[in-house]
Amino acid sequence: MKKLPQGISTFSKLIKNNYIYVDKTKYIYDMINEGEVYFLSRPRRFGKSLLVSTLEELFKGNKELFKGLFIYDLWNWNHDYPVIKLDFTKIGHKNPQVLETSLDDFINQKARDFSVNLISNTLTTKFAELIEQIHRKTGKEVVILIDEYDKPINNHLDDIELAKKNRDVLRNFYQVLKGNDENLRFLFITGITKFSKTSIFSDLNNLTDITIQEKYAKICGYTQNNLESYFKEYLLELSESTEMEYEDLLLAIKKYYNGYSWDGKNFLYNPFSILKLFYTKKFANYWAETGTPKLLVDLLKTTNVDLDILIKKEYEFKGTFPNFELENLDFHTVLLQTGYLTIKNEILRPPNSSLYIIGIPNKEVEESLFSYILGFYTNFSAESIEPMTKKMLTYIYKQDETKLQKSLETLLHKIPNLIYGEFKNEIEAYYKVLVISWLQLLGFDIESEIMTLEGRLDALVKHKDLALILEFKYDDKKSFQTMLNEAENQIIKRGYYKPYQNMNISILTVAFKSREVKCKFKLLNELLKEYKNRK
């Protein structure tokens, strides 16, 4: 049985040491034959570096590594090319000076590797000279592979001015690529984000962005077929250790880890989570182990964001994959490019551009996103969120409003004063998002702001045969009892419960006042009787 390639992104190491390699060379072959300059955006831990490493070995002509793969009999092994691979995870970037020095050191090292002498002094002219000299010395066109091109920018979004300065360094550095067409055989650039104003996307007129092209939607990540064919033995082992039927296991894995897509048709697994699942033989949130992207952390610190994405089922964008502007950071774009949102569907509307439906990929990512944002806004650690949610689940099942109320009070009291001040003008919506997000973490199916014939209810929690209708009220001037009564009356008067009468229906009303909260559970039949008496 081949080994699990955990943490290995070097193609030669996978092949030589009997690790599983999911063959992506068909997409590589098509890409190379159709063009010369490409950009690909994918979230972290999705196989970008392995893809770059595979391209490196292919262009170097290391034929034996590709035996048995799709490309082996199709590639012209009589030609090899000099390769410059620039991995920005190995380039210093704490300020523009360090970035320039690190890039200069990289160029000097490459000059030594290829035994060429450089006389230029500036960074950009030296890079251009390096490419030209390698071409001249070898008599072969040069292949350039740039991995994580955006790291010097998105690692500094907590300091936009510094990020801009690093962007300017990169813009000048990348401009060299435009004037070197005659020296280049192939250029491939990867990153998490697609930043504007870095010259890659404005100056490289012949660049093809394959991020959301259907043809290359499966170039990174594992398909369902990949999972069931390459990892068959590991699936059987997991089925035995978890005592789950094989088909039930596949469904569970799909629900928890599948769902990433860049065309709305082909849905994928993140390799990191799947490999961890097979290694530990436990269903768990491995996405969180990779760490929340600094990009998302910094955005939450510096910008008021629309938290409704936590509870809405869909979000839309039109046209091409959205660019990222340092001057105008957009929360939804961050979530999309970092993998917390994915393309669920593409609606073609000729002659206009496509409309993309965006949503959270799977249960693992949902838990990661909710846990992180709740932790950020309430000062709860990820470790403390899980046990508290389990307790709340018990309180809801038992409809223990006293203990549930205490949990909600704990939640509200943990909100830092600074954040409370920022949201004070829209605190009702903010509280509602926090409470519903917490319920989502409990494993409930949450539907928020559902339109009915008579109006819009705040939220509906469904679990098995239970339907829990939620209504929130916030008013600093009214009493808690008044707000709770108003919420109950609204549910009955507008008939929010009518579509769910085939289920066991309970009502949960929640009233907020400043940082205080009161909640009330009632069975529907009980509330209907009370409503008649109130009238």
Question: Residue ranges of each PLM-predicted region?
Answer:
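Structural signature of nuclease core domains in nucleic-acid processing machines
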Residues: 401-535
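Phosphate-binding site recognition
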Residues: 1-427, 442-443
